[in-house]
A protein has these predicted regions:
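Conserved RNAP core-binding helix
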Residues: 18, 42, 46, 56-73, ...
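Short amphipathic alpha-helical boundary/capping segments
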Residues: 21-26, 130-139
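Short helix-capping/turn signature of helix-turn-helix
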Residues: 40-43, 51-54, 137, 147-154
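Structural recognition of an alpha-helix C-terminal capping motif at a helix-to-coil junction
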Residues: 47, 61-68, 81-93, 172
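Arg/Lys-rich amphipathic alpha helix in sigma70-family domain 2
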Residues: 72-79, 88-109
């Protein structure tokens, strides 16, 4: 199970080009392109929003806000950048604005964990509970780094840019987080 977090089934070169094309079509006013972008990226956007807001309903609302902003700002995307990075930066910025406004720092409830889509990764209920327990032991920033790498397939360098952290810090926090999770999953920290 932990190996799923260490490697991803992600084809960044193909996805990057396809996402760039979708953004160009969105900038041209094509609603179908927005629907396709939403279908392909919503899990990653929602996961990042949930990691910041810690409330399933707020994360769903913010996810919708991200795609409204994509529709309004698609012409501002520059193809030299990562489309997923652009989208997740937009999500992060909206999350930070909402958190400043509402000053919310609560823990995820059981109901909110259930709202996280895990069907795509093939986890059964027991594995999901174990993973939840392991993730809950991490600091917020460590959890964000692990989820960004595991859910979105982002490279550590992209995560560092998104979170505005030095690459060595991201790598250190990622490996420390995996070590904590491994310890928990092996029963050393139960």
């Amino acid at each position: 199970m932990l190996s799923m977090l260490m490697t991803t089934e992600y084809a960044p070169a193909e996805d990057r080009h396809e996402l760039q094309q979708l953004l160009l079509h969105i900038a041209g006013g094509e609603r179908d392109a927005l629907a396709e972008l939403y279908q392909r990226t919503r899990t990653a956007v929602y996961g990042l929003a949930l990691s910041y807001l810690k409330n399933a309903q707020d994360a769903q609302d913010l996810t919708q806000d991200v795609y409204v902003q994509v529709w309004d700002c698609a012409e501002q995307y520059r193809p030299t950048g990562s489309p997923m990075g652009w989208l997740l930066t937009m999500c992060r910025n909206l999350c930070l604005m909402r958190m400043r406004r509402e000053e919310r720092h609560a823990a995820l409830s059981e109901e909110e964990w259930d709202a996280i889509p895990t069907q795509e990764c093939g986890l059964d209920a027991d594995e999901r509970a174990l993973l939840q327990g392991a993730l809950a032991r991490l600091a917020d920033e460590e959890r964000r780094i692990v989820l960004l790498h595991a859910v979105t397939g982002m490279k550590h360098r992209e995560i560092a840019a998104l979170l505005e952290l030095p690459l060595p810090t991201v790598l250190s926090k990622y490996h420390r987080a995996l070590k904590k999770m491994r310890s928990f999953l092996e029963g050393d920290d139960a």
